[in-house]
Amino acid sequence: MTRPFVLPDTRPYPTSPIKNFLLLNAYQLAHNSSAASRKLSSEQLQTEIRGMLSQNHYINLSLAMTMAPDVGTYQSLMDSVDTVLRAEKDGEIQWFALPIVIVAGCKQDKSLPLGLPTDALFVCLQNYPYLRSLTQNTRWLPYLVQSDELSGITPGDWWQAKQNTDSAERFLQRFSLRPLSLPNGQSVHVVYALGYGGKDVQPVLGLNLQQAGLPLMQVWQEALALTGATLFTNPLSPNTPLKALADGSHTRQRMAMDVFSTNAIRSIRMQSPRVGVVVGARAGGQILFGFNATDSAFEVMPQIFTWELASTDKIAIVQQNFLDLMVECQIEHIYYLHDALPENSELPTYAQALKLDGHNPLFSKEP
């Protein structure tokens, strides 16, 4: 069976193999077909990472995180780091984070206060038994954390912060309340509610919000309401900080692409009967989504969204999410470029792209 076409992965992976024990095990964990071999690699990987963090000497881990040869190896490595950073013994701390993606629209620059609506949030969470443990014997930071601050925390910092309650309290002191800057126009952001508890919160982590999704959205809508700004909030599942960061970053970029795409389609339809969409990979770890008229006679200024691939992004999922959006918007003229574009080169218009090697994914799954 032929595999469906996936755009080229142009992330800057190492060109020669790296002799790093962590990467060797992470690669085996990601790619070995033997369950026994994967289990052994997983155990060795976690043991090695645990030893490095406990000795506060993890240069090899930092190297491995920047030199993974593919997305699967990187994901295996990060999953192992995440496992080691969970509360493993009684008395250790389990950190958790709840991402909130915010779509903002305003006619001038604004500052959004990020205080945590603790009472309303706890009342909402307590209504759902599968989320209730987040409110029992837990401690929450009284304000939301911005993505740049949370992503700047090292595995070594998280390791120290999970040792006991005293270390967790010291860790919380590193954060400070900062308003979120909303630029003029439309923008998409992600912030995080951060807290800690014991091992009993672990079953909640990664659970789908289910029926709690809409009530939680209403809590954030009311708490973050700002005069002169239109806000839409999208709460995501509670998770460990590392996984919450990955979920939040991916969803923020996906929602930014959705907002850009619908705006571009609307503006082109005002001037042309048919919208043409071109999708192509570009060297440097980017996927470009371009919108224009199908007919060169109606072409307008190209509107292009650039997706910067994170280390954990799966291109096939990014592609499929975009294709689903195009179907929802009733766009039929879509063209996937088979070959990656050189770095800094421009994405061709729809009319130009049809002369290049590619296909329409709605009518052909294969090149």
Model-predicted segments: where are they?
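Detector for methionine-enriched segments
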Residues: M1, L45, M52-L53, M65-M67, ...
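Charged, amphipathic alpha-helical stretches
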Residues: M1-Y74
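Long amphipathic alpha-helical coiled-coil/heptad-repeat bundle
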Residues: L45, I49, S54-S151
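Extended, non-transmembrane interaction/recognition domains
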Residues: G105-T349
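C-terminal recognition-helix end and immediately following basic linker
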Residues: E346, N360-P367
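Short cysteine-rich clusters marking metal-coordination/redox-active sites
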Residues: P348-D357
